[in-house]
């Protein structure tokens, strides 16, 4: 299939879900009813849903078939051992705990690592700081409700949508080490490496950067947890962009990457392609105590440690999905779909972040320069996109970032982005063309789009349930 300008989707569509078309008037009323928050829209009112790629895509026939093997035993399920074997084979990690999704893993490991640091190193909870290349929203939320100050240490190119860099998800290693020294290593219970880096635009982290980060972590005896939702996409970018690994397989790159962490927390609803599921895993004997403490907490919060909130069939499906999500031709198609969408948007003058994995990220701050950050330009753009075309997207900016839990002040956000998240094996090139045409219509009316202000603001993870209105 070489030398073709464009290759179609590398799969056949066997089952379809009908969607309804709505009028502009209907969508305007739906948006008002939702409090100008697309999270609160009903899915039946969405024509193209780009809110997230988390559990919203198709599954493979092998994944669906695997569910028939499910062992629903309460403890010691053979389906658990199938999942644990997949984790060992792919990542090299000895200890596996299934969870219902990624935040289930976070609510377990975060308090355990904090308590361990306090017990062994004398951590002062009032001075506790945790670091990441950029925390995902729920990881940030769980860290904050456990009393930690979160610090994102990213490279200067990360949020410059005009800059080109092969690995915009990288840690700024100098800032990381300086931050640890300023906080005191004993007050840093963990470092989280997010791959790919969602908030920066699905941007990858190089293996060279992983090595440097892990060397710093080892120097100060700080455990590293890999936030692994998009581990396969990151491996694909390493293969395509990091010279030393151009001849490695996705499987080889993945295994190598996870040498530079002590544990992983995964929302398996992304690259593992399942509609529900998560994983918490630890590398070796050095993390055995943490593993056992997490198992105990799992019983209270998720379920018995050999099912962790998942039925046996779901664990079987996840074990297969971990492998299916790493297929070379699948990843090449998926990234090409993002690149096609970004190129089309930029061609009509819509500014975007450099193409990464899983989504196109529109620079709403540049598209709507008349709306200040505290009136959430990307959220306003999201509302307008829905009203124009029935497309639901998600804000990745000041609205999502939220307030400092100690001062109550809005946290400064490096960019105001609108994420157009592409569910796996769900939308075709025709859908991408429709999205581009919709943005052309939005752009024509951009100067008339109004900023937003709160009518209801939750204290934690406000972007999920907040309600807003237009600023008059």
Curated annotation (Swiss-Prot):
Its EC number is 4.1.99.1. The keyword Plastid does not apply. InterPro entries: ArAA_b-elim_lyase/Thr_aldolase, Beta-eliminating_lyase, PyrdxlP-dep_Trfase, PyrdxlP-dep_Trfase_major, PyrdxlP-dep_Trfase_small, TNase, Tryptophanase_CS. GO terms for molecular function: tryptophanase activity. It catalyses: L-tryptophan + H2O = indole + pyruvate + NH4(+). Pathway: Amino-acid degradation; L-tryptophan degradation via pyruvate pathway; indole and pyruvate from L-tryptophan: step 1/1. It holds the Pfam family Beta_elim_lyase. Homotetramer. Belongs to the beta-eliminating lyase family. This is Tryptophanase. It comes from Haemophilus influenzae (strain 86-028NP).
């Amino acid at each position: 299939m070489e030398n073709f300008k464009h290759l179609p989707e590398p799969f056949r569509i066997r089952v379809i879900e009908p969607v309804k078309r709505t009028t502009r008037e209907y969508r305007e009323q739906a948006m008002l009813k939702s409090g100008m928050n697309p999270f609160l829209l009903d899915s039946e009112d969405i024509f193209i849903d780009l809110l997230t790629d988390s559990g919203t895509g198709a599954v493979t026939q092998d994944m669906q078939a695997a569910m028939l093997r499910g062992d629903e035993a309460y403890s010691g399920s053979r389906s658990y051992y199938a999942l644990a074997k997949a984790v060992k084979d792919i990542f090299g990690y000895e200890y596996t705990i299934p969870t219902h999704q990624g935040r289930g893993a976070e609510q377990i490991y975060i308090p355990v690592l904090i308590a361990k640091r306090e017990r062994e190193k004398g951590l002062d909870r009032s001075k506790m700081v945790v670091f990441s290349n950029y925390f995902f929203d729920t990881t940030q939320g769980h860290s904050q409700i456990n009393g930690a100050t979160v610090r994102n240490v990213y490279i200067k190119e990360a949020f410059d949508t005009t800059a080109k860099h092969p690995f915009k998800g990288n840690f700024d290693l100098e800032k990381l080490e300086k931050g640890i020294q300023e906080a005191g290593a004993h007050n840093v219970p963990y470092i989280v490496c997010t791959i790919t880096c969602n908030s920066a635009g699905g941007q990858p982290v190089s293996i060279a950067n992983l090595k440097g980060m892990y060397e710093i972590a080892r120097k100060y005896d700080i455990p590293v947890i890999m936030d692994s939702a998009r581990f396969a996409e990151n491996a694909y970018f390493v293969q395509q962009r990091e010279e030393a690994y151009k001849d490695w397989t996705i499987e080889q790159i993945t295994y190598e990457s996870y040498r530079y962490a002590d544990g992983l927390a995964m929302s398996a609803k992304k690259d593992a392609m399942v509609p529900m599921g998560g994983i918490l895993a630890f590398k070796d004997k050095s993390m055995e105590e943490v593993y056992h403490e997490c198992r105990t907490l799992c019983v209270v919060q998720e379920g018995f440690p050999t099912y962790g909130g998942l039925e046996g069939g779901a664990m079987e499906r996840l074990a297969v999905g971990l492998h299916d999500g790493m297929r070379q031709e699948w990843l090449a198609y998926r990234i090409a779909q993002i690149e096609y969408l970004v190129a089309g948007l930029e061609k009509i003058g819509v500014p975007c972040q450099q193409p990464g994995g899983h989504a196109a990220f529109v620079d709403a701050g540049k598209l709507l320069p008349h709306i200040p950050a505290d009136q959430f330009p990307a959220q306003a753009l999201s509302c307008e996109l829905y009203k124009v075309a029935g497309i639901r997207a998600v804000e990745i900016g000041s609205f999502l970032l939220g307030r400092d839990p100690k001062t109550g002040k809005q946290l400064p956000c490096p960019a105001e982005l609108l994420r157009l998240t592409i569910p796996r094996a769900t939308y075709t090139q025709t859908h991408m063309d429709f999205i581009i045409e919709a943005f052309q219509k939005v752009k024509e009316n951009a100067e008339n789009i109004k900023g937003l202000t709160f009518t209801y603001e939750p204290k934690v993870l406000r972007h999920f349930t907040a309600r807003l209105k237009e600023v008059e």
